[in-house]
Amino acid sequence: MQSYLQYRRIGQVVRKQFADHPEWGQRVQGESTDPSGNTSENDETVWEKRSESRPLALPPGVQRRDITDSSGTPSSVFLVSWEQDQDPMNPRNYSMTARITATLIVSALAFAVGAASSIESAVIPQNAAAFNVSEVVASLATGLYLLGFAAGSLVSGPLSEILGRNAVYIGSLTLFMIFIMASGLAPNIGAQLAFRFLAGVFGCPPLTCAGGTIADLWNPLEKTLTFPLYAILSFGGPVFGPVIASYMGQGTLSWRWTNWIMLIMSGLVMGLILLLQPETYGPLLLKWKAAHLRQVTGDKRYRSAMDVQKIALVERILGACKRQFSLTVHEPIILLISLYMTVIYIVLFTFFDGYPFIFQDVYGLSQGLTNIVWVAMYVGIAAAGLWVPVVYGWTKREFEAASSSSTTTTSGTGVVPCVTGIDPNVNAEGEHGQQEQEPEGGRDEQNTKNPHPARPENRLWFAMLGAPFIPIGLFWMGWTDYVRHTPNPQLKTTFPPNTNKVTIK
């Protein structure tokens, strides 16, 4: 719903602009010369038919480009990009309230699918008894859900770059809810495990694409504040899953209510997405704008980058899958971070099965109270927020230094920086001469609102600060896991490892 209204608003803006500037819609006959300079009659006829007519003046943010299609035929298009630094249609220029709301909704979505990953661990004894299997087999409900995450992540990213963020969120969440419901109705353990795996496949897009949504809304410096917020809230899902199901299956409330609770929670988040979440993927918004420009002007040459660079869905998905393995092989830093993240998630989800052995077998706590112990773990996750102001200050100074260095270099070479929104190659008639290629990502990368790119290593501050906490916490836990100690030291050991989880993410 919100995406549809957003599409309508873009159309209203385009129509109003053309009503205020009627000269943008005036036309003259196109050139009769081939872009290569040939002037043969045959070439002239072909080029005239191809170019037809063009606007006398192009709207802001539209540039004329000569391109060659897949068949080798040259053609001219009007490439649609952001109008200016403060283009209101650019997601990074939404109001602060709108951007925070969108970030919180994505965080709530990640919380819901994250909670579904761990909530079954709270009712493993009841699940095993109901299906007459061992608790080890029943614990596969959690493991297969995570395998579904891994499988779905290969496809969800490329899909969001074709269909947009909201389409992937809504479509995947709908299927996720269907399979969660099927898991709750499963008549045997085999059916439940199969449906849990499929729920994981369709539950992964919020986690895979959420980083893209955050990047759509916030510039690199702002992400130093907003991404930890998203990480702290989203990591609350796996932690609070067992807390939500603490006493399910032990009284009148069936253990199957773990699925119904997740279904209700997912439905509420779905309502928020439909009613409040705007589309944030910039290339798709520009595609919508180009479609409205074609409709208003009748000129089919208005195109966005997505229209010009047509890549089949299957080809894009295969390319994304290949890229992940290629980067892992050729980029050691990606391989190392991936392995480290794997270890961290192994530690996190090992706790789901390990806590009952510690707090029930050693300290004699009840099943429900053992699940509530997970609240202490979230304190450690939230504590990672204490590092945010410190790292933000370091990051800000890094960006300022990079910007200052860039300005000095530009001044020393005598290069006049191009002001976004003013194309020095455009004449008074809106015609374009030879132009340099825009940087990847369009003019938004040169947006003066966005800080100059700094060193990639700058993003490792959080990771370096949090890395020591994993071994400290695990050593602490092993050292105090004896009946002669009270449960208090064990509760405190949950803080350090979970602080690390957020800082690494």
What do the predicted segments below correspond to?
Residues A151-G190:
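Conserved MFS/SLC helix-loop-helix module at the cytosolic interface between two early adjacent transmembrane helices
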Residues E222-Q250, M265-S266, G380-G385:
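Glycine-rich segments within core transmembrane alpha-helices of 12-TM secondary carriers
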Residues A98-E135, F351-P356:
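Extracytoplasmic
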Residues F195-L233:
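Cytoplasmic helix-loop-helix junction between adjacent transmembrane helices
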Residues M1-S95, Y281-A320, W394-E457:
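Intrinsically disordered, low-complexity terminal tails of fungal membrane proteins
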